[in-house]
Amino acid sequence: IAQVSIDPAYQLKPEAKKSAPIDKMLGADISFLPELEAKNIKFSDKGLEKDAIQILKDHGFNYVRLRIFHNPAQPKGYSPTKGFCDLVHTKEMVKRAKALGMKVLLDFHYSDYWADPGKQFKPLAWEGKNFSDLKKSLYDYTYEVMQALKAQGTLPDMVQVGNEINHGLVWPEGSFSNTDQLAQLINAGTAAVKAV
């Protein structure tokens, strides 16, 4: 039986308000869109060139999913030369989606690169931190991203604290073999989301 420590520094706050229920959710992960557009790739619907997000909306989509990496521009990151899926790109994408009336699911990878069941490498900036500082870094980063989105009036409608965390997140501290620490990291990220 797993036991989970509750860190009083990351107490969960109740939600400020409940989202209005929706009849259906139909969404797409459009995180690649800025990369495709940077390559001058165009999108069309029945021969008419349109914004890709508008095409989704026109076909009944009401949600988009956007991933965010901690620092994808660092040399071993996801996008060393462009920084795709960083906070700057994510803010712009959320703004575009919200302007078209789409809802947004924000997916925190807590890595500079892909995080999935086979790898959950912590950001380079968090390497060497003790667990308490690692947890604080995860909280602070989550809070800063949420605050930045709130400041531009585009808070996400849903947040995914970690990507594909079947085997944990922010390895090795948050691996599934360290369930107490994993739970504390998830709790810290969730607390940061709810604090905004």
What are the residue ranges of the model-derived segments?
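N-terminal substrate-binding region of glycoside hydrolase catalytic domains
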Residues: D7-K103, S111-L138, Q160
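Active-site cleft segment of glycoside hydrolase catalytic domains centered on the general acid/base Glu
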Residues: P80, C85-H89, A115-V196
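Bacterial Sec-dependent N-terminal signal peptides
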Residues: I1-I6
